[in-house]
């Protein structure tokens, strides 16, 4: 509901009406639902059905692909120039199979580190008081790192499921489902990570509702902090929806501190004239994520999110894969 409220606010204060752009069907020069050179709107009579269809598409199309008037954002380019729906579905199903297996491997690894605490739905802290400080934080570091990759796999897998369903059920085109991420592990700055390489699903809402209102009064720093603070509120509300209480300081604090990190990068550029980047930038980005990642992952773990099982034990991808390998070895 909070997301719907934000998107409704964006639509109410839009400077001009949203219009549909041509959709790429078979290499007609349109890239990711947007025309490569000079976008032109689709001129046709509006029927009740087309109006309802457009409204539905705008509602679920968080990145505004195929729409003119939506906040422009970075859309990653696919490594495969897919034009056939069947090819997209087959490639996506293959990717889903791999993502499912990777997700289950990561989950098993994390659960094995806390089988009686955070590795179960009842939850528990990732900080083990029975260990020495070096051991405790090495363990929490591993858990945080694995949980970060698990989050990426979960979000990407969910996106791939929707790509298959919408392509089959609603006959959408491959150009309407470009990649969601742009290799976030290659980020050499927090600005690059959040502005380009991580998913941009909520960017329009964060910019229009959280960033622009503060930019007028607090400048660039206020603009950045407004967007990240709103992101923190959105994710904290998601945690509260589980019915296990809120942890605003930890959940929202993670995003607020990333806003602080981005502000620091801009201050560095203004002071030195150089952008954050290279190997040093990668180490900085990785360290900042791990440092504050401990905070949000511990909040997830204490509420049982880390220990949730998505597959029945008998049908876990790793179980099915090992059973298949066992049968194959017996047969040979």
Q: How should these model regions be labeled?
A:
Residues 155, 164-240, 274-332:
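Membrane-interfacial catalytic/cofactor-binding modules of polytopic membrane enzymes
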Residues 1-9, 93-106, 141, 145-149, ...:
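Hydrophobic alpha-helical cores of multi-pass transmembrane domains in eukaryotic membrane proteins
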Residues 1, 108-144, 216-221, 236-252, ...:
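Membrane-lumen (extracellular) interface motif
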Residues 124-138, 142-145, 149, 159-182, ...:
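Glycine- and small hydrophobic-enriched segments that form the cores of compact globular domains
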Residues 52-55, 66, 267, 291, ...:
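Residues in intrinsically disordered, low-complexity segments of regulatory proteins
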Residues 9-16, 105, 109, 165-169, ...:
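Structural signature of transmembrane alpha-helix termini at the membrane-water interface
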Residues 83-92, 144-151, 184, 192, ...:
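Short, charged/polar micro-motifs that form catalytic or ligand-binding hotspots
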Residues 1-131, 135, 144-159:
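Intramembrane catalytic core of multi-pass membrane enzymes that act on lipidic substrates
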């Amino acid at each position: 509901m909070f997301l719907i409220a934000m998107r409704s606010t964006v639509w109410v204060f839009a400077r001009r009406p949203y219009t549909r752009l041509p959709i790429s069907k078979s290499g007609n020069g349109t890239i990711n639902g947007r025309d490569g050179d000079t976008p032109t709107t689709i001129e046709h009579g509006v029927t009740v059905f087309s109006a309802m269809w457009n409204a539905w598409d705008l509602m679920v199309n968080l990145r505004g692909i195929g729409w003119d008037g939506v906040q422009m954002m970075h859309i990653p380019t696919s490594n495969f120039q897919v034009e056939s729906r069947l090819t997209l579905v087959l490639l996506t199903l293959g990717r889903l199979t791999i993502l499912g297996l990777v997700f289950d491997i990561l989950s098993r690894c994390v659960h094995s580190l806390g089988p009686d605490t955070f590795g179960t739905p009842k939850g528990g802290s990732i900080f083990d008081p029975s260990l020495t400080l070096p051991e405790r934080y090495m363990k929490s570091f591993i858990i945080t790192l694995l949980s970060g990759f698990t989050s990426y796999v979960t979000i990407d897998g969910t996106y791939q499921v929707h790509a298959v369903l919408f392509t089959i059920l609603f006959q959408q085109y491959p150009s309407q489902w470009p990649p969601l991420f742009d290799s976030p592990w290659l980020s050499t700055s927090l600005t690059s990570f959040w502005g380009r390489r991580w998913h941009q699903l909520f960017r329009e809402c964060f910019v229009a509702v959280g960033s622009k209102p503060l930019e007028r009064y607090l400048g660039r720093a206020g603009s950045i902090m407004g967007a990240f603070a709103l992101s923190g509120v959105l994710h904290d509300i998601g945690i509260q929806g589980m019915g296990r209480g809120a942890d605003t300081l930890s959940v929202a604090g993670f995003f607020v501190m990333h806003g602080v990190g981005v502000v620091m990068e801009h201050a560095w550029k203004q002071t030195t004239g150089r952008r954050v980047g290279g190997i040093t930038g990668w180490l900085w980005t990785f360290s900042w994520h791990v440092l504050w990642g401990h905070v949000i992952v511990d909040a997830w773990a204490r509420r049982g999110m880390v220990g949730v099982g998505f597959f029945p034990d008998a049908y876990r991808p790793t179980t099915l894969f090992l059973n298949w390998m066992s049968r194959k070895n017996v047969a040979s």
